[in-house]
């Protein structure tokens, strides 16, 4: 291969790398502005593909063909780089537009200039490659492979290196620098390339047009590829989670298959033989459709395969990411390699013309237009209406049908090949692809630390023991409800997001009740519906209106299985359900809330992570009344201490006064004014039968049980989070760091670090009947929960204030549990001196006898 071609291939490789970097950054910036709904995602993808299709079509004009291809390509790259640097303010302004349809239109228009330039690059470079005796399909296959190979590196370098190093927006400078390198490098090397303008005249008697069948084929290939990609992305999120790393690995693997397929096709294509090219193209469609359907069958075993990998990587992030690549490759590579072959094969089937660039432009434009249609229809329509499996099946059948049409029109029609394609259609129609939903919905990846102790047989039995009550592939997530014994679990993309188990039940109810200790809220916003328990808890209070924001309609459907626990909040006229992206809705809503509860609890999940940033907390704060409160829930499990400190510090930056409650599930309450808790109000809440019963159901039988769940106050937060960095939309700190520690168990060490800064709860209480009584109640609750140090401190302070039988008895019990026998005996004797009822005295006397016995402790 000549040095000229090597240089052009290298330039196109770098162009693909920069293009995918831009796509990732622009997609994230746009979704932050217009919301991360399925329609928004589809619109952004379609805007990219559609803009590139327009660019390719424009590049096919003879007016463009007469330009110097190297200079034109260099200019296109330079323009894209400049536009990338200018784009952030343009994209940011879209957020201020209220109407979503106008936002979508503006997003499309904002991307058009750059994507048109990107789409024009392949047809332009094809003309530079025309100076060769090499078959056109070979050169174009190599070009396409080089560009796609660069695109493979784009998401990997962006997520694994550029985002963590320089942040989201500065990554645009990295991409722009690559484009500028290509631009100026080509211009400087132009003399060595020896290329100039090309005269375009059709060969005598031959047409420069492209057969409609070829346009339809590459268009359908592009559409089916995007349907597969969207469906596979959802499938893989149920197998190994949807962290930013998993998503980038999935995208890179998808593109890798296309690059390999195109490169191999270019390598093995021979000289033209009449009719053979069409047959080869049809066979590529048959292979892609067949492998797509086979991927559904393979996916059934992938959760168990992931667990096998987990046992070997033992928490290593690098091995985890490699296992994600292997799993993604098993699903996608065979099909995408066949898809990668379609464009070179279609070029090979073109009629001869002196304007090869124009023909390729039309083909490439049709392929990209199909991709745009496939992306939009899959994201906004197919997955929600047909589901994952049947969307893939529909796309596969369409591809096979097109293959039959091509075979029938081919001069070298093969009965055998036609029979294979027809049989494949019948087989796909006959087989039910929806098997394995239970295994995928079970979410083996999320509990891998526990499940790794089981052999595969036992694990399969455990999965089978979970009855699948509900399953729906929604626009943004796959939602399931599973039941084992009396426990029901809400699964979103395989991860348990809610359940009626004791731990989850307590947290879901508590975040609906706890904020009312700080404010008598009348208008409340709840971000995330989940099981509906939190909204149900809020509605037990005398609120005037509750706005509940949920992005996934299937979650609302699934919540009906939790009506015994949530009280069917949908029937309450005070509730307004808002289906959409909460962040976007809060930004455009001019109303004010006394209380906002942010229920999503997983900072490592893509699409959820932007609800834990400084930017979101500022948006939420701007929608609170002067005395308003934001309540934030997040899990400690799977979080490192550094990530936990960063999240709390970010919350603290926005809210001057912060109190943290609970343990493995941490609940933050933030306000502009000091957070104080009225003991009188707390008792009144418990006196309300509906609220008291709800709290008791959550395992909080007494008011003091709520109080002792306080872990940090503002002073403790400052000490715990000292010098912790902020988590922002731009640095993506939590989204990038949390997935790396997902399988670590740092909960105990985090809680131990927090205990060093345990607050004096009494200092945050008002309307106390007496401090001695309150401290005695706190000591009792601490004692019950096993926090003996805190129990002892409050019991001693209670006794120091007032000597009472109950106070002395409790102090003696705590000291006995701590093994301090002599001090326990003295406290219990003090209880007897203080009086007490007969039954209580008998209990104390029995304890004293136990302490006096040789085995007493």
Go through each PLM region and give its residues.
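SAM/dcSAM-binding transferase cores
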Residues: 679-771
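Alpha-helical tetratricopeptide repeat
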Residues: 769-783, 809
């Amino acid at each position: 291969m000549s040095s000229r071609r090597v240089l052009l291939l290298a330039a196109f490789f770098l162009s693909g790398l920069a293009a995918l970097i831009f796509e990732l950054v622009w997609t994230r910036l746009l979704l932050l502005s217009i919301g991360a709904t399925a329609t928004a995602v589809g619109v952004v993808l379609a805007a990219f593909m559609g803009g590139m299709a327009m660019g390719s079509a424009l590049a096919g004009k003879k007016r463009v063909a007469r330009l110097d291809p190297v200079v034109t390509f260099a200019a296109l790259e330079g323009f894209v780089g400049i536009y990338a640097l200018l784009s952030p303010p343009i994209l940011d302004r879209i957020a201020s537009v209220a109407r979503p349809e106008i936002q979508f239109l503006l997003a499309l228009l904002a991307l058009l200039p750059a994507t048109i330039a990107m789409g024009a690059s392949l047809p332009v470079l094809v003309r530079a490659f025309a100076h060769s005796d090499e078959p056109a399909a070979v050169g174009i296959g190599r070009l396409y492979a080089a560009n796609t190979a660069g695109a493979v590196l784009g998401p990997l370098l962006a997520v694994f290196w550029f985002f963590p190093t320089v942040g989201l927006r500065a990554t645009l400078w990295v991409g722009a620098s690559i484009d500028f390198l290509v631009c100026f490098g080509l211009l400087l090397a132009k003399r060595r390339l020896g290329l100039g303008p090309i005269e375009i005249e059709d060969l005598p008697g031959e047409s420069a047009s492209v057969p409609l069948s070829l346009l339809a084929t590459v268009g359908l290939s592009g559409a089916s590829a995007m349907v597969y990609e969207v469906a596979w992305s959802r499938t893989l999120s149920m197998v190994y989670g949807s962290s930013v790393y998993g998503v980038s690995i999935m995208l890179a693997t998808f593109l890798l298959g296309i690059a390999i397929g195109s490169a191999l096709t270019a390598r093995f294509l021979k000289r033209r033989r009449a009719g053979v090219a069409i047959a080869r193209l049809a066979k590529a469609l048959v292979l892609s459709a067949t492998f797509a359907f086979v991927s559904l069958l393979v996916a059934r075993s992938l959760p168990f395969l992931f667990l096998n990998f987990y046992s070997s990587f033992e928490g290593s992030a690098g091995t985890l990411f490699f296992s994600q690549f292997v799993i993604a490759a098993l699903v996608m590579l065979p099909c995408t390699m066949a898809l990668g072959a379609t464009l070179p094969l279609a070029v090979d089937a073109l009629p001869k013309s002196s304007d090869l660039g124009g023909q390729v432009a039309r083909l490439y434009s049709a392929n990209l237009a199909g991709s745009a249609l496939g992306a939009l229809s899959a994201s906004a329509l197919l997955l929600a209406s047909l589901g994952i499996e049947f969307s893939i099946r529909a796309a596969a059948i369409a591809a096979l049908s097109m293959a039959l049409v091509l075979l029938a029109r081919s001069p070298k029609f093969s009965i055998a090949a036609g029979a294979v394609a027809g049989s494949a259609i019948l087989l796909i129609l006959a087989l039910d692809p929806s098997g394995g939903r239970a295994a995928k919905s079970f979410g083996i990846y999320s509990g891998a630390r526990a499940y790794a102790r089981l052999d595969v047989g036992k694990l399969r039995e455990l999965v089978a023991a979970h009855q699948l009550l509900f399953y729906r592939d929604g626009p943004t997530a796959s939602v399931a409800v599973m039941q084992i014994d009396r426990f029901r679990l809400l699964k979103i993309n395989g991860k348990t997001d809610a359940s009626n188990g004791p731990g989850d039940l307590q947290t879901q109810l508590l975040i609906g009740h706890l904020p009312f200790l700080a404010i008598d809220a009348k208008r409340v916003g709840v971000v995330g519906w989940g099981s509906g328990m939190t909204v149900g808890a809020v509605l037990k209070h005398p609120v005037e209106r509750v706005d509940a924001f949920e992005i996934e309609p299937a979650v609302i459907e699934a919540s009906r299985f939790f009506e015994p626990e949530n009280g069917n909040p949908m029937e309450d006229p005070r509730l307004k359900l808002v289906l959409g992206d909460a962040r976007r809705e809060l930004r455009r809503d001019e109303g004010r809330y006394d209380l906002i509860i942010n229920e999503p609890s997983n900072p490592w999940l893509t699409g959820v992570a932007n609800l834990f940033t400084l930017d979101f907390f500022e948006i939420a704060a701007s929608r609170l009344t002067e005395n308003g409160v934001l309540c934030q829930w997040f899990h400690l499990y799977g979080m490192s201490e550094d990530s936990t400190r960063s999240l709390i510090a970010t919350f603290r930056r926005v809210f001057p006064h912060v109190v943290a409650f609970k343990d493995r599930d941490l609940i933050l309450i933030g306000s502009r004014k000091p957070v104080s808790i009225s003991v009188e109000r707390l008792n009144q809440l418990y006196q309300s039968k509906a609220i008291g019963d709800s709290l008791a159901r959550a395992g909080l039988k007494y008011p003091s049980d709520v109080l002792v769940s306080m872990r940090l106050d503002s002073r403790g937060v400052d000490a715990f989070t000292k010098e912790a960095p902020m988590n922002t939309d731009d640095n993506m700190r939590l989204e990038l760091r949390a997935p790396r520690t997902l399988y670590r168990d740092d909960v105990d060490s985090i809680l131990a670090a927090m205990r060093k800064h345990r607050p004096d709860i009494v200092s945050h209480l008002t309307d106390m009947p007496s401090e001695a009584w309150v401290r005695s109640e706190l000591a009792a609750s601490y004692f019950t929960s096993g926090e003996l140090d805190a129990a002892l401190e409050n019991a001693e302070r209670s006794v120091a204030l007032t000597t009472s039988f109950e106070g002395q008895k409790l102090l003696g019990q705590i000291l006995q549990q701590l093994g301090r026998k002599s001090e326990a005996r003295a406290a219990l004797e003090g209880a007897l001196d203080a009086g007490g009822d007969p039954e209580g005295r008998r209990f104390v006397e029995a304890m004293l006898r136990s302490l006096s016995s040789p085995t007493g402790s």
